[in-house]
A protein has these predicted regions:
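N-terminal secretory signal peptides that target proteins for export/translocation
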Residues: 1-7
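N-terminal soluble segments of membrane proteins
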Residues: 2, 141, 245-249
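C-terminal capping alpha-helices of c-type cytochrome domains
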Residues: 11-34, 107-133, 201-263
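Sequence context surrounding c-type heme c attachment/ligation sites in exported
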Residues: 32, 50-57, 82, 149, ...
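Ser/Thr/Pro/Gly-rich low-complexity linker/stalk segments immediately outside membranes or between
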Residues: 33-47
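Periplasmic/extracellular electron-transfer cofactor-ligation site
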Residues: 45-49, 53-79, 87, 91-97, ...
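Extracytoplasmic electron-transfer domains, predominantly the class I c-type cytochrome c fold
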Residues: 78-126, 172-225
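Ferredoxin-like iron-sulfur electron-transfer modules
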Residues: 139-146
């Protein structure tokens, strides 16, 4: 007891107790703040899921089912991930305006907040590809134009044409132009495979290679279109072929007419 009393009277006891008290209060505050932030985030996510569910029931369930299980006219959305919803709804392809062979890009029906709520709701049903963030989509930093052009010609040009202008497919379907598409939506299309497009997993195209493809597309958008008419970015070759074909055809026609007249 006497020793404890002497320790209490020690000149360092006061500062040590003060430091200990501050550390205790700071630690308690940090723990409480972390718990509060987690609770707030969970509450916000729950609210988004509920909002997305109501939007889904109102605008999507008639085709995809009340529980997104799919049906006769629409596939299941369980496991497609937030990226698929963000692409389809964020580009106006969904909801479809008619039951055609392929969903066309059109004006977006929902606000960005509603699109995100729908994506969060569908993502809550089962794991799937996530919406890429700004850090991941830094194609200017992590992409290569030369590599992207080579990858595009190898993997994409057979459908989207070598200049990314799109092209016709079978059974009334088509590959849309990739010009003017947001980088986020290009990345989402690569990882989700919308419509007739295959899925390019990270084993097929790494995230860095996907960024290179995006960088090449964005570079191609800024390139001047040569020739009198912008026919698919082919340049003057198309116009020259057209003039040559018409010119030769007219000359042949004139030659035949003159020969017939001479008889």
């Amino acid at each position: 007891m006497k020793r404890l009393s002497r320790l209490r009277r020690h000149r360092a006891a006061g500062p040590l107790l003060l430091v200990f008290g501050l550390l205790t209060i700071g630690t308690t505050f940090q723990v409480a703040s972390a718990v509060t932030n987690t609770t707030t985030l969970n509450a916000d996510r729950s609210a988004q899921i509920e909002e997305g569910k109501q939007l889904f029931i109102k605008g999507c369930s008639s085709c995809h089912g009340l529980n997104a299980e799919g049906g006769v006219v629409a596939p299941s959305l369980i496991g497609v991930g937030a990226a698929s919803v963000d692409f389809q709804v964020g580009t106006g392809r969904m909801p479809m305006s008619d039951m055609s062979q392929q969903a066309m890009r059109k004006n977006v029906v929902y606000t960005p907040e509603e699109v995100h709520a729908l994506a969060v709701y569908v993502a809550s049903l089962a794991p799937g590809p996530e919406i890429p963030g700004d850090e991941l989509l830094n194609y200017e930093r992590d992409g290569s134009i030369a590599e992207g052009g080579e990858l595009f010609r190898t993997n994409c040009a057979m459908c989207h044409n070598f200049a990314g202008q799109g092209g016709a497919l079978t059974q009334g379907k088509w590959a849309p132009s990739v010009m003017g598409v947001e980088a986020k939506h290009i990345y989402e299309a690569l990882v989700t495979g919308p419509q007739s497009m295959p899925v390019f997993s990270d084993k097929t195209l790494t995230p860095e290679e996907k960024l290179s493809v995006i960088k090449w597309i964005k570079h191609a958008e800024t390139e001047p279109q040569l020739g009198g008419i912008a026919l698919g970015r082919v340049g003057p070759v198309t116009e020259g072929l057209l003039v040559w074909t018409l010119g030769i055809g007219m000359l042949i026609g004139v030659a035949v007419w003159l020969a017939m007249k001479a008889r």
